[in-house]
């Protein structure tokens, strides 16, 4: 699954990641959950809910979604769950998708699904998968977001006709295989791409995860495929 156009797409994506741009909502969400202790998340529950909720809103997850009918209080069980997890979860990335780490990802995915996806929404795995993976990306950074563009891109790249509607062992293995095939360029961009700090608007010393780099590439490829089709 080696790709020759990764740098081109990533440079194009990064043109729209200034401090006030929509894409940078990821930075502020990821920084917040990565940098703050469980105690801080719980003691500042309203802020924690607002950070996660606005990130999801900024990334289109309120559009035509049951979330549009919810207040920020809806996110409280998610914050409590995140606060229960140890800090090792922020060390998981595609370069260490071991069996143990994959099982951790699958467990968090399933736990969050049971907490936040209403019964009447469970019949739409693609919509649920998009929401859950956007939460996992924004909070932990250890998996790409399975949105429409990413699904389109990786169905095309992997030739896997069943697509990426949900997080499962097979899909994580495909992402891992993609990483291994393109390791040099993904590692390069992960090392040089830093998050923005909300307070100063300057770059931090926190690098984008490799999963986030893959997310960016998949998003841009899917966007182009959509334009070509139309």
Predicted segments with their positions:
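Short hydrophobic alpha-helical segments that form membrane-spanning helices or hydrophobic packing faces
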Residues: 131-138
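An N-terminal alpha-helical hairpin/helix-loop-helix interaction module that forms a charged
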Residues: 1-123, 141-230
């Amino acid at each position: 699954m080696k790709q020759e156009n990764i740098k081109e797409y990533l440079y194009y994506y990064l043109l729209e990641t200034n401090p006030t741009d929509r894409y940078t909502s990821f930075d502020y969400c990821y920084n917040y959950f990565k940098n703050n202790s469980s105690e801080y998340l719980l003691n500042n529950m309203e802020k924690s809910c607002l950070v996660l909720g606005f990130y999801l809103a900024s990334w289109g997850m309120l559009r035509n979604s049951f979330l549009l009918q919810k207040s920020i209080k809806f996110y409280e069980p998610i914050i409590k769950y995140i606060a229960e997890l140890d800090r090792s979860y922020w060390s998981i990335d595609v370069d260490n998708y071991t069996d143990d780490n994959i099982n951790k990802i699958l467990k968090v995915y399933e736990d969050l699904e049971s907490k936040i996806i209403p019964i009447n929404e469970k019949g739409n795995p693609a919509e649920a998968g998009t929401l859950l993976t956007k939460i996992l990306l924004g909070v932990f950074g250890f998996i790409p977001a399975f949105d429409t563009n990413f699904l389109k891109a990786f169905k095309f790249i992997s030739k896997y006709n069943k697509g990426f509607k949900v997080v499962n062992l097979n899909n994580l293995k495909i992402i891992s295989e993609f990483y291994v095939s393109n390791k040099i360029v993904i590692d390069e961009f992960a090392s040089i791409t830093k998050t923005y700090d909300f307070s100063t608007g300057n770059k931090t010393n926190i690098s984008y995860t490799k999963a986030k780099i893959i997310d960016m590439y998949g998003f841009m490829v899917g966007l182009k495929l959509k334009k070509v089709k139309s």
